[in-house]
């Protein structure tokens, strides 16, 4: 049970068979992932293509900021081997300018599919999530 996903800043290779990944148990849908990416881009954080480790640290911070550490959001950092995923939403690969450049799920045959255009409903959800996150940020900044 959950809405799980893995988010990676780079894909495994022969030279580097394991890469760091962010695991989200809740809010792992494309709408939430892209909304978090939008926040990172707006804040002008270095992107995953130019500095993967920095980008990962910043993204974890944004997840905590908007969904709250105390709210048991089930967020973690793990290793990704290029073959496994956590089910539900699969794996998102981030690239330059905080864009989702690949999105895939592993089946028994590990078949990948490219992330395509969002539907209007996905765009609407993304905007609603982003608006919620902005309100959360305003509350945090308003605290004495």
What is the meaning of each model-derived region?
Residues 1-5, 18, 86-88:
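Short, surface-exposed coil-to-beta transition loops
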Residues 15-54:
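Short, flexible N-terminal segments of the mature chain
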Residues 4-9, 92:
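Short beta-strand scaffold segments in enzyme catalytic cores
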Residues 39-144:
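Low-complexity intrinsically disordered segments
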Residues 10-16, 94-98:
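Short acidic-glycine loop/turn motifs at beta-strand connectors
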Residues 9-10, 25:
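Short His-Asn-centered micro-motif
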